[in-house]
């Protein structure tokens, strides 16, 4: 029971990280004026893509424990 709760919580966490990074990246790409305080747009986009990739990799790894 606790095993399932922990695994589900981790899955929710990683999915939330992906959603947050995707939403922020979309704003950066579609409304760059809204982020004037971030002059390093390419670096920030790269950081968000890294965050998405990391969370997706964690989700794939997590699937091995859900079997």
Predicted segment positions?
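Extended, charge-rich alpha-helical interface modules
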Residues: 2-67
